[in-house]
């Protein structure tokens, strides 16, 4: 199937009598309720269920193996190839399926808040609530922008269309396929809305580095003086909590680009976890869930329509989607200068990493590539004790290119803009999980505040004898003994053994990076 034929098929779909283009939020909410796709909560949000798929489905994600990208993609378990033939046949079937629908919903908008680098996109949805979701998550065009909007990438989403693995070359009924040549994302068999968000992120992770822009899975905020901070970290490390600072404005909570102009948000909204959400713990998120927001897999009371964020009957991965402007303390447009401070967050359940340490450029690249945190008991079947987990660049499921490309760009930008990088352990202290205790949140906030203010740049440090990290000896508001992890353990020999064990896990994980420079390994990794 040629690109011309793809465009003809899209044109027919977009110009069909069933296509509802660029409906407003109230119109979409009405459609959701009339079509019985979801319910209205007491705060005016739409609550919808995603059926059996309550999270991303990484084994069902494919990139079409096309001549123009075959040598660029890091093929493997994350970036699974699928043939053009399989894609073309499935695409044709999905289009025929959607043409028969009574209504389709189309959103036109952008990915990328910096106008110089933004990607015009369109999303064709079978579900009205999915269209409301993308309306809130991506960047909404002005009326003037809409008149000249020409999409450069299209998501075609048909959650009720099920693939046949024997015929379609998929692993299950669900599929998320990206064709870079045809500029199409094809989604079916799953109702989980996050697949649309993360597909565009994966695309930006391919396109932006080609323009010399580092794409990053991180949150970002900016201080009153214009000083920018990035927060990288896997799930459960405190990224959302620690980047929501009343004294700093939020640039974005999840996906960013770093260009020669500075940092920009890729999105126009937030997709926040809301398990155990309360006004006391996360006031910004709690208050943002108003009319037009989307709650995913959250149980609501049949009578009062009040959301019960503590109920995980459907999944622990309950989510809220809302536009950036639903938060008070933000920067709009979501662009800022170059980062002054970069924070890597890790929840180390072995209790051996320092609560904060300063990183050299090589150490920053090493820990960026490592993307370390701990997987705790109970999060997955078969996990009975905490396990080290490594997610390359703090976002391996979304990286189409070789990881070293992103790390090299980070190193170059750190050096060029003199960004200070810190590794912050929000995990355990005084012993491993089950013996020690979780790091005091007040101490973590004080350490991050000291890093952001520049205080730590002039603080005396000591080199950690196993990890080679520079550990500050004094941080305002934090007891000195907390800063050196060995001092918090009653059994010093047990500390050393556990630290060496983790250092060896870092080294074993790093063996997969055969294309990185020796400097990163020799100057960035553990020294014992």
UniProtKB/Swiss-Prot annotation:
GO biological process, one term: gluconeogenesis
Binding site for ATP: 198, 217, 233-241, 282, 319, 444
Textual note on the cofactor: Binds 1 Mn(2+) ion per subunit.
Keywords: ATP-binding, Cytoplasm, Decarboxylase, Gluconeogenesis, Lyase, Manganese, Metal-binding, Nucleotide-binding
GO cellular component annotations of the record: cytosol
Gene3D superfamilies: 3.90.228.20, Phosphoenolpyruvate Carboxykinase, domain 1 (3.40.449.10), Phosphoenolpyruvate Carboxykinase, domain 2 (2.170.8.10)
Pathway: Carbohydrate biosynthesis; gluconeogenesis
GO molecular function, one term: metal ion binding
Subcellular location: Cytoplasm
UniProt similarity note: Belongs to the phosphoenolpyruvate carboxykinase (ATP) family.
Role, per record: Involved in the gluconeogenesis. Catalyzes the conversion of oxaloacetate (OAA) to phosphoenolpyruvate (PEP) through direct phosphoryl transfer between the nucleoside triphosphate and OAA.
UniProt protein name: Phosphoenolpyruvate carboxykinase (ATP)
Species: Bacillus cereus (strain AH187)
Upper lineage: Bacteria, Bacillati, Bacillota, Bacilli, Bacillales
Gene (UniProt): pckA
């Amino acid at each position: 199937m040629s690109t011309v034929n793809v465009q003809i098929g899209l044109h027919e779909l977009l110009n069909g009598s069933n296509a509802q283009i660029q409906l407003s939020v109230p119109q979409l909410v009405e459609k959701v309720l009339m079509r019985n796709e979801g319910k209205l909560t007491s705060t005016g949000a739409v609550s919808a269920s995603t059926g059996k798929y309550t999270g991303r489905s990484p084994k069902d994600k494919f990139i079409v193996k096309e001549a123009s990208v075959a040598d660029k993609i890091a093929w493997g378990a994350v970036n699974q190839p699928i043939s053009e033939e399989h894609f073309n046949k499935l695409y044709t079937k999905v289009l025929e399926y959607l043409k028969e629908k009574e209504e389709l919903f189309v959103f036109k908008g952008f990915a990328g808040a910096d106008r110089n680098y933004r990607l015009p996109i369109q999303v064709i949805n079978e579900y009205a609530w999915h269209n409301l979701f993308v309306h809130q998550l991506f960047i909404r065009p002005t009326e003037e922008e809409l008149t000249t909007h020409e999409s450069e990438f299209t998501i075609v989403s048909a959650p009720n269309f099920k693939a046949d693995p024997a015929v379609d070359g998929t692993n299950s009924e669900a599929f998320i396929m990206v064709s870079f040549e045809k500029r199409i994302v094809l989604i079916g068999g799953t109702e989980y809305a996050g697949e649309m968000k993360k597909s565009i992120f994966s695309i930006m992770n391919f396109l932006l580095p080609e323009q010399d822009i580092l794409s990053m899975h991180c949150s970002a905020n900016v201080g009153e003086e214009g000083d920018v901070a990035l927060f990288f970290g896997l799930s459960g490390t405190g990224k959302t909590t620690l980047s929501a600072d009343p004294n700093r404005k939020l640039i974005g909570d999840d996906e960013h680009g770093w260009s020669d102009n500075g940092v920009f948000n890729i999105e126009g909204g937030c997709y926040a976890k809301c398990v155990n959400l309360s006004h006391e713990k996360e006031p910004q998120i709690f208050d943002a869930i108003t009319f037009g927001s989307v709650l995913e897999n959250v149980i609501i009371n049949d009578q009062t329509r009040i959301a019960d964020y503590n109920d995980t009957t459907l999944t622990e991965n309950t989510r809220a989607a809302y536009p950036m402007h639903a938060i008070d303390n933000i920067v709009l447009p979501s662009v800022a200068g170059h980062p002054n401070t970069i924070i890597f967050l890790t929840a180390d359940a072995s209790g051996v990493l320092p609560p904060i340490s300063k990183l050299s450029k090589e150490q920053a690249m090493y820990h960026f590539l490592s993307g370390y945190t701990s997987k705790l008991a109970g999060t997955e079947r078969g996990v009975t004790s905490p396990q080290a987990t490594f997610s390359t660049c703090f976002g391996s499921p979304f990286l189409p290119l070789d990881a070293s490309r992103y790390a090299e760009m980070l190193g170059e930008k750190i050096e060029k803009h003199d960004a200070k990088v810190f590794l912050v352990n929000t995990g355990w202290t005084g012993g491993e999980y089950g013996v020690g205790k979780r790091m005091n949140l007040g101490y973590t906030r004080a350490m991050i505040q000291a890093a952001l203010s520049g205080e730590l740049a002039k603080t005396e440090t000591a080199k950690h004898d196993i990890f080679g990290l520079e550990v500050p000896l004094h941080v305002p508001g934090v007891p000195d003994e907390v800063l050196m992890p060995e001092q918090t353990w009653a059994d010093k020999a047990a500390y050393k053994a556990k630290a060496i064990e983790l250092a060896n896990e870092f080294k074993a994980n790093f063996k997969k990076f055969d294309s990185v420079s020796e400097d990163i390994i020799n100057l960035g990794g553990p020294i014992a």
